[in-house]
């Protein structure tokens, strides 16, 4: 009898086997829309202002953007609120070719804890992070559909510490589930991450040293102590 495979096995396998150039796919989407004179509506899930900086500078040339700040993984309420304020401040300071607005989702950390129950001791970048991606992208897709957006995407792919192959695989799957197009991305390409550091300095943004959840915070604190 063959052993039962974990539910996420296929996604992990596809992400590992198919090193897709998601930036190239995004370039193609942008080129096609530009040829047709179309400025689509995009819901952009934002994890924080520093990661958003380059994504907004880049995407606002081609999309009308609604930034969706939904991050129940941020365990400390004060941290959540400060990051939200920084996101709003950044948007108020930047200049955009097309309109950029922001809405914030419901803050309920218990939603995150419920999603990752049993995975508390997983290492960073493992199954717990996958559950977190799913939670945030699922709610983002539903919000995008409610608002009538053409696409939804996330700033998460800009981080060198995040698996863009996995995030895009999950995003595409969720997009198909709700009937909203997933905008493929790998924002760390074209030196996007380096550009985000430059923009963060320009706008004097708060740059946290952990992703947001209490588990990532403890991992960073442990590494510093060692």
Question: Can you name each region flagged by the protein language model?
Answer:
Residues 9-226:
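Nucleotide-activated chemistry modules centered on ATP-dependent adenylation/adenylyltransferase
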Residues 5-6:
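N-terminal leader/targeting signatures
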